[in-house]
Amino acid sequence: MKDLVNFLKAQSKTAEDFDVIKIGLASPDMIRSWSFGEVKKPETINYRTFKPERDGLFCARIFGPVKDYECLCGKYKRLKHRGVICEKCGVEVTQTKVRRERMGHIELASPVAHIWFLKSLPSRIGLLLDMPLRDIERVLYFESYIVIEPGMTDLEKGQLLTEEQYLDAEERWADEFEAKMGAEAIQSILRDMDLEHECEVLREELQETNSETKRKKITKRLKLLEAFIQSGNKPEWMVMTVLPVLPPDLRPLVPLDGGRFATSDLNDLYRRVINRNNRLKRLLDLVAPDIIVRNEKRMLQESVDALLDNGRRGRAITGSNRRPLKSLADMIKGKQGRFRQNLLGKRVDYSGRSVITVGPYLHLHQCGLPKKMALELFRPFIYAKLESRGYATTIKAAKKMVEREDVIVWDILAEVIREHPILLNRAPTLHRLGIQAFEPILIEGKAIQLHPLVCAAFNADFDGDQMAVHVPLTLEAQLEARALMMSTNNILSPANGDPIIVPSQDVVLGIYYMTRDKVNGKGEGMLLQDPREAEKAYRTGRAELHSRVKIRITEYVKNAEGEFEPQTNLVDTTVGRAILWMIAPKGMPFNLFNQTLGKKAISKLINECYRRLGMKESVMFADQIMYTGFAYAARSGSSVGIDDMVIPEKKYEIIAAAEQEVAEIQEQFQSGLVTVGERYNKVIDIWAAANERVAKVMMENLSTEEVINREGNPEKQSSFNSIFMMADSGARGSAAQIRQLAGMRGLMARPDGSIIETPITANFREGLNVLQYFISTHGARKGLADTALKTANSGYLTRRLVDVAQDLVIVEDDCGTHEGIVMSPLIEGGDEKVPLRELVLGRVAAEDVLKPGTEEVLIPRNTLIDEQWCNIIDENSVDSIKVRSVVTCDTDFGVCAKCYGRDLARGHLINQGEAVGVIAAQSIGEPGTQLTMRTFHIGGAASAAAKESSVQVKNNGTIRLANVKFVTNNEGKLVLTSRNTELTVIDAFGRTKEHYKLPYGTTLNKADGAEVTAGEIVANWDPHTMPVISEVAGFVKFVDIVDGLTVSRQTDELTGLSSILVQDVGERATAGKDLRPAIKLVDAQGNDILIEGTDVAAQYFLPGKAIVTLDDGAEINVGDPLARIPQESVGTKDITGGLPRVADLFEARKPKEPAILAEISGIVSFGKETKGKRRLLITPTDGGETYEEMIPKWRQLNVFEGEMVQRGDLISDGAETPHDILRLRGVHAVTEYIVNEVQEVYRLQGVKINDKHIEVIVRQMLRKAIITNAYDSEFLEGEQVEVARIKIVNRKREAEGKPLVEFERELLGITKASLATESFISAASFQETTRVLTEAAVAGKRDELRGLKENVIVGRLIPAGTGFAYHQNRAKNRHNALAAEQAVKFSAADEAEIDAEFNMIADDPTSSLAEMLNMADEE
């Protein structure tokens, strides 16, 4: 028996114990060594006997027996003949599964180039030979000869000759030279290459050349040559002489009934190759005419191409059904390929799926499992129990009992299932909370019951959703399911650290209803001795739920020892709140309950409970809230009737007023005072404002009601209108939706996002007429179409994010860096969007945090900032804190715990082995899908808020202006002429309270440093047009303003007023393209006026679409507008702008018209202009080299001649390019930019994501650097290398006292970063499989199996989570084994030598311990 076990073990020997996977080119000998025989015939199987043909594609002699332990002719059967080779049919008697692993080969009659190395761009063969791909193809496909050995002729090696040229040459020189065609020619050239010599030549060229393109080309070639030298690949192996044949069971041929066969396409492709190869062999034996042989060789080349990668060159070979055949390359790439279909995701056993329904009586850690399903899933366990209990003697008997469903089976099932967790999964699994573990409770029926509180995490509802059940089998799996995946362990969301087990809908409504108060309710003013009595009073009808009463409340407060002490107070509260207090856990303060609890407040309750009392209490509390909420929601009897949608009387007045305003604008438009665009914008603003007013009136009307209090006086209180309660509590619906029910629907959007200017003045209660309905269908349908498209987009974004971040794991506790990023609160306008405490909570301080204005340390360095520290920060009004960040972490492969900070889902410092990369990717990707699915909920209603046109300050304080330039107009007001002016209001402590951006042309009412009081308007501007402001006074002189060429005159029919419209460059006639319309200012004599303090003439270039209302020669003052540029009309902002925006940011795409930034600091001047461009010069003040850049003339510049700029300043407006920010402002700035821009999109949608997740992705985008100075290291200049590798090399060089390698960080988009990863397995399974594998094979790459994906693919535990320890142990064992091996190698002679040295050290007391250690190290 023992032998049998050992034998089976030996049979299933897989190379388990490897640490690296290497890929390379296969030499012909290697292919022969894999092979078990040559396939000589194209036959497959005999159609009558279904037996494989000998020497054919399915030959049993080559590939192994068709039946287990049985040869083909049937002479040897059974295990006893194991290993015998039958002398009759030549088949080895063994298991049939060897047909899955034994390969064959085909000896090709003529060499064939491997299409991947030929056609996969850049062509490797082409690069190596330094020949264009077209030429190589002409040789390979027998159109030209190539000179291999020129001999004494005047031909050159590698020269192409046509048929005629070849014949001429042959006549002239006879056999002096050698020229061939086809793959053999290419092969012999490759074989003759001297790689080392080529490398040397190239290195010399690289030193001598100055042109950038040449350098790039040489570097590329040099890298390829070096790769060949280092990897030990031979170039001629890119041309094959032997073709491997896939094992037959991987390309099956299955007989169908009716004599037909279902076959894999590969068999067809192989058959083609074998047929052509055999024909070629015969032709060569017969010494057929050259032209026929040549044709056959070409066909062989084409058939091998098709087998390897069909359709890569020429037309794809198609099968009988006109579909292209699936080649070997197609087998591995794409979603259906080997990598993604079989290696990264597999179907699993022991699983089932069913519809879900509500389980309101379950505990949080339970789910209801239908008995039928449980019986099927736990079958083997039941069999085992039945046998061990003696109810069944054999498995067969047990099976019968289970199928009969005997009574005993149900008892055993209940026992088996007890405390055996199961996993529930709802697709799409967008984040890790999409799979959670529960304890099953057996139920009747066929639907799985799910606890309502976990619905938010699964994003599940009960409208027909299905969920899958999986059974963890091994003890370890059960342990992990219970300890890590149990729903009770996942109370907080990993995306933002807020509770995700939060009541919603009915529960919220019930709790809200309980905790509302009412004026003059029944039993108001009662004195009750405890909540129990309050409940009694409510149940017996002596008091209403909402009545205001006095009750003795006992709270439990922690004392100094950390034990709870009771404290009893008489509190003013309501009966309902007292009843709710009965379920509160010990240690919660009553004031959290003594308020009207909406969804946010309940979430805060659970959060507080978690932070104060821990997980167990929170879970029980959440369950209790749910039961109570359901009960009281039912008691409240809330329902929605049409009369609940109360339409305010004022609505019609507001609408009439708005219509009046619109009519006025229309009149102005007809008199030519405003343009079409301005009219459109103003009309939309009017309606948006009207809509807001209607909504406000409606909400006031709906939310309050007047009642008579106990004294008999009228008093206002919150209304008990059902619709209002649902929205106010956060149970369902929002103000925007109620506005559509009872206010007015408002403006609608067209599918392209522009707004239809006719609003829908009706609401859903009044009903829409045909036109209104039609207008609203527009936007609503777009919403539905978008949803379908964007789900896919968002899923793809998540996939790219996961792929780029998959190998980022916490690998050590502290990297010891002092770097970090500075956090300060985000202030937009007058309100603090994100307070500092939210930004630094759960981060580690990078430096001591000092009390403002003193040297007192508030928070020491390396402290994890938790809620208590946040309170200290708030109390001391700290303005900014430097915190550790993933981006600045110094760990080489991975991140350290201190730089990451708190594990958001657990609330403590993150553990080692946590896969933070994947968590980050999921946290960013998950709301993407939710948001994309949420486009159409407001029915396409355009939420265009009225544009701001002034700054009204909200706090008292002092004004500070940054980046400001202005002129004073003749009214004495300041007019801004700078474009990125920022206005901040600071309080007496110097803390920023408000922050505004002011546009060009703003009129300021206050100067820098002026005191302001709340409510003052300090600046105003026209939001719809941008003026061009004159900085000097004088007379207008038109330059290049030619009617019909550069401008068109618009005369208004009604008023006769004319204005000049500047045309866009693209729309002008050819003659006008080079003209630059401008307004020059001259004095009365017609001389140029200079701008103050410079020698630049005051000349203002007019961009396209600008409107000039002045006439030539008009007189103007300082600060007057010369022209107006209408601003584009507003589109709707929803995540549509959002998801593509996020993708663009993470892909680090350059925007269409990027902002131009100053490359160096210095003084701006303008040089000689060319046809369409201006020459911008920046002269550094410290006397460096002047920088010059050509800028298209149509770009509006933010700088004037003679102005001082800092490196990285804006020169021309536009979207900033992250690459520029990185280059000019550094890593911190680019991190901040990407984090803020991504957060902006999510914040608009009200989604909370912690910054550190985005930082994790940014770290991965910054993984690579470009070498700028390599000195004598292993790198090449201009090479792209992982920063971690450069750091390792630099540490070594520092120790040796050599100069450090210099490099420049590079920002890669996530797709590029994924493909540029060190691991080729990970990259190949992501995208562009062919390209990645070709590159890796040529370079002979090694995959160290560091990331998660590579390990999943080779079938190991991932090096994260519980697999982290496993991998660490493996590494340790490997290290020890190596050390042991080294130790064994010591011989007696070595030992003697060491002894002598040690004696020497012992004799010489001056030698230090360090030397001994050094010696030990060297050994």
UniProtKB/Swiss-Prot annotation:
Transmembrane portions of the chain: none
EC number: 2.7.7.6
GO aspect biological process, one term: DNA-templated transcription
Entries under Pfam families matching the protein: RNA_pol_Rpb1_1, RNA_pol_Rpb1_2, RNA_pol_Rpb1_3, RNA_pol_Rpb1_4, RNA_pol_Rpb1_5
Cofactor(s) in the UniProt record: Mg(2+); Zn(2+)
Keyword Transcription: yes
Catalytic reactions of this protein: RNA(n) + a ribonucleoside 5'-triphosphate = RNA(n+1) + diphosphate
Cofactor note text: Binds 1 Mg(2+) ion per subunit.
Record-listed Zn(2+) 2 binding positions: C815, C889, C896, C899
UniProt-annotated binding residues for Zn(2+) 1: C71, C73, C86, C89
MF-aspect GO terms: DNA binding; DNA-directed RNA polymerase activity; magnesium ion binding; zinc ion binding
Family named by the database record: Belongs to the RNA polymerase beta' chain family.
Function: DNA-dependent RNA polymerase catalyzes the transcription of DNA into RNA using the four ribonucleoside triphosphates as substrates.
Protein name: DNA-directed RNA polymerase subunit beta'
